[in-house]
Amino acid sequence: IMKLEEIIDISKTVGNSLFKDITYIWEVLPKIEDNIIDIGNSLDKDKYTMIEENIWVGNNTKIDKLSTIIAPCIIGENTEIRPGAYLRGNVIIGDNCVIGNSVEVKNSIIFDNSQIPHFNYVGDSILGYHSHLGAGVILSNLKNDESNIVIKGIDTNMIKLGSIIGNNVNIGSNSVLYPGTIIGCNTSIYPL
């Protein structure tokens, strides 16, 4: 299994405190729910505004009126949330990101400068700095038999676990990643 620093740069997310005291990177995901409100409350008030209870939005961020945001959620500065985006709660989105049309995100951390622009599902996942999902990319988070996700022989004790995507990754259109997939830094997956 790759080391944390070989996959992502935790300085590129306001959720970096979640990565302390973990053995495996996926152990961050269950910590989001218990910690996101504390992270939100500690954000710089000059950079973030609470637009609704437990929904924090950074300066110069554009949120389309046809998007849906369920609390708790943190959205960084200079980010764009486009029409039809559905943020289902326990979501941390970085600065300079795009969450596009018909994109659903839940219980995930999206690092700075990442783009999820069209018709994507991102559940129980981590997208590293400057990553991009092509149109229709799905990060599947549940096996058909609903058994625990196992990564390289290690039982994660999680039924729902999407993908861990490293820094500078580009995943081509219509790719579907199996639950528990880990993609290292500087990787391109060609479109289907």
Sequence positions of predicted segments:
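Structural signal for interior beta-strand "rungs" in well-ordered beta-sheet cores
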Residues: 45, 49-146, 150-191
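Terminal amphipathic alpha-helical/low-complexity segments used for targeting or macromolecular assembly
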Residues: 1-54, 181, 185-186, 192
